[in-house]
Amino acid sequence: MPTTITNSKRSKSVVRITGNTSTTITMNQLSTNTTTELVSSAEISHVTSSTDGKWTIYRGNDASGEKVLCLFGENEIPLSQFDVTIAGANTTANLYITNSGTDGTLILTLNKTATYTIDPETGFPIV
């Protein structure tokens, strides 16, 4: 099923997933350019979802990873308004996301930590 990731350099990433799915989001997928931006970790700062089943988010490459969030029905969780994020014990692990229902949409806003390639002549990050 469709997965769309919108990345902003030095800012957040927004992940949109639809339908009955099992998908892995890697840290590299959260980068605007893996040559100049190396994403090392990500935390969930906002969640919007709907499903006729259950959305489950794990840290890792499959369902054996740490379960960090389960969502039923319709949800709007603006964690960033309360200076809270959901990360799990290993913020550097990939996100594995499943939907047990036949339909639904999940939109995640992710705060990310990254390092940037520096221009050796100017000392400024390469854009």
Give short role names for the model-derived ranges.
Residues 1-38:
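Transition segment at domain starts
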Residues 1-10, 99-127:
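C-terminal interaction-tip segments
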Residues 15-17, 44-47, 55-57, 95-97, ...:
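Hydrophobic beta-strand residues in large extracellular and virion-surface proteins
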Residues 28-55:
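Beta-rich globular "head" domains
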Residues 52-71:
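Short, surface-exposed beta-strand/strand-loop-strand elements in extracellular ectodomains
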Residues 62-64, 82-87, 109-112:
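Long, compositionally biased regulatory regions of eukaryotic proteins
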Residues 67-83:
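Short, solvent-exposed S/T- and G/P-enriched segments that are highly enriched in secreted/extracellular
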Residues 83-105:
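Noncatalytic modules at the cell exterior or secretory-pathway interfaces
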